[in-house]
Amino acid sequence: MKKLQPVRGTRDVLEEEFKDFQAHLMLWNTLTMHYGFNMVDTPILEDSEVFKKTLGVTSDIIKKETYTFKDRSNNEITLRPEGTAPIIRFFINNKLQKSLPQKFSYVGPMFRY
């Protein structure tokens, strides 16, 4: 029988590595909050236009490196390949430009192949 493997671009994280990552994440959060960054989290799934508008339709990331699919309503959805575009969408949607400057910190999975 074929051995099942994690999907390309993903991996399993064992307990020791997970604990180490959590410790680093706690330190990161403490430092960024100390220096006035706001912790934010954006969805792993975004409308593909979020990335096309900020990265460009012809960029290698869009053309070759994203996990993109259509949902049941035929909307094109992309797994987040990087963090800047979702932060820009977040910033605009929440009208945060009214209170500048803004500093954001974010951590999360990014998906490219």
Listing of model-derived features with the role each one plays in the protein:
Residues 1-113:
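TRNA-recognition modules of translation machinery and tRNA-sensing kinases, especially anticodon-binding
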